[in-house]
């Protein structure tokens, strides 16, 4: 099973901006590693939440399309809300 997500570059940083994203059904994330700079991105919460229900999401290489460029990544860390079934933040590491 392969996973491919469309992402936007996130320009607004900080707690308030992240809360606004989550309120709008999006989740903040970051892609880092390799020789390229780290990129803060925005993903659709429901698509990622549905995908993470599969074990393959954690073990396989994922494809994230950011500004027309495909990034091959693996999940490095996921932060979840303590009482709600919501994702708070994701970290991806480039392959």
Swiss-Prot record:
GO CC terms, sorted: cytosolic large ribosomal subunit
GO molecular-function annotation terms? 5S rRNA binding; structural constituent of ribosome
Keyword Cell cycle carried by entry: no
> What start-end ranges are recorded for coiled-coil regions in this protein?
none
Q: Which domain of life is it from?
A: Bacteria
Q: Which CDD domains does the entry mention?
A: Ribosomal_L25_TL5_CTC
Q: Which UniProt keywords apply?
A: Ribonucleoprotein, Ribosomal protein, RNA-binding, rRNA-binding
Q: One GO BP annotation here? A: translation
Query: How the protein assembles, per its UniProt entry?
Result: Part of the 50S ribosomal subunit; part of the 5S rRNA/L5/L18/L25 subcomplex. Contacts the 5S rRNA. Binds to the 5S rRNA independently of L5 and L18.
HAMAP family linked: Ribosomal_bL25
Query: What does the sequence similarity comment in the record state about its family?
Result: Belongs to the bacterial ribosomal protein bL25 family.
Its biological purpose is as follows:
This is one of the proteins that binds to the 5S RNA in the ribosome where it forms part of the central protuberance.
- What protein name applies here? Large ribosomal subunit protein bL25
Write down the species. Glaesserella parasuis serovar 5 (strain SH0165) (Haemophilus parasuis)
Give the classification, highest ranks. Bacteria, Pseudomonadati, Pseudomonadota, Gammaproteobacteria, Pasteurellales
Gene (name only): rplY
């Amino acid at each position: 099973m392969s996973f491919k997500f469309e992402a936007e570059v996130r320009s607004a940083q900080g707690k308030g901006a992240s809360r606004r994203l989550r309120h709008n059904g999006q989740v903040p994330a970051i892609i880092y590693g390799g020789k390229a700079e780290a990129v803060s991105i925005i993903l659709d919460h429901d698509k990622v939440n549905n995908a993470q229900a599969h074990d393959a999401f954690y073990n396989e290489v994922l494809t994230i399309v950011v500004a027309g460029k495909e990034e091959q990544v693996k999940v490095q860390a996921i932060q979840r809300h303590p009482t709600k079934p919501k994702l708070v933040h994701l970290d991806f590491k480039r392959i």
